[in-house]
Amino acid sequence: MRDCKKRTNFAGCFVVDNLIIMFGKLFKSKKEQVKLFYNTDVHCHILPGVDHGSQSVEQSLEMLKAEAEMGIHRVILTSHVTAVTFENTRETLMDAFMKLKDAVADAGIDMELYLSAEYRMDEYFDKEYAADHLIPMPGNHILLENSFQQELMNLDDLLFDMQVKGYRTILAHPERYNYYSRRRKRYEELHNAGARFQINILSFTGYFGEEARDSALWFVRNGMIDYLGSDMHNVKHAHIIMDYINSKEWRKIAPELEQTVKNDMII
């Protein structure tokens, strides 16, 4: 700091120097973004133009930059594959994937990308599964989505059949299926049968409602969270997650999550 004694306006000098100190403390006290304790996002909708997630390459790049800010260096792109609404195929997903990979390289973003999908268990899935058209994650993991209205009637049989064929089944955001929150023993049955659970960080924030939040915390208490996902559809979701992982609650539950979460083991 400059020496005030060499200046003629001592009062002005005092005010200026104190403002410098105040603003210096303000900027120094700004918290750095807390990083996640893992480096792999296993569930997101960053692939452009194939579902109701990212709608452009530019938006995808912004979302990937947000992932990097949270400490993510590997992203498994899991766009919706759903009857009628998003009947994506290997070809449509691969085309978008190659465009995004080229854009990421051109932008100089340090991010490993992997192509997979989030499969709604419906009639379109039955057709794709029978034709052996699924795009699994590394390690032959497959992300499955249940209906939000009711459980698939033959869920147990399907999971067993997929496991026999070598797939490692992951149930996407089970905390969001409110019909399970009223009979949580079903969670235990599915987990014991070999299904793994991926919980959305957004659910902890209350973004999907209090019932989903309560179920997410139940999973923490019972040590049944195998994977965490952003389920990011836009940059707004990223900002909500960033705020949450800076919270006291996240600092409290993160050590428990570290005991069970295996995101980085999937690749």
Named regions from a protein language model:
Residues 17-109:
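An N-terminally biased module of ancient metal coordination in phosphate/nucleic-acid-related enzymes
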Residues 23, 87-196:
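Extended substrate/RNA-proximal surfaces in nucleic-acid metabolism proteins
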Residues 81-85, 120-122, 176-180, 204-207, ...:
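Active-site environment of divalent metal-dependent phosphoester hydrolases
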Residues 194-206:
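His/Asp/Glu-enriched short active-site or ligand-binding loop at hydrolase and phosphoryl-transfer sites
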Residues 224-240:
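Short acidic/histidine-rich active-site segments
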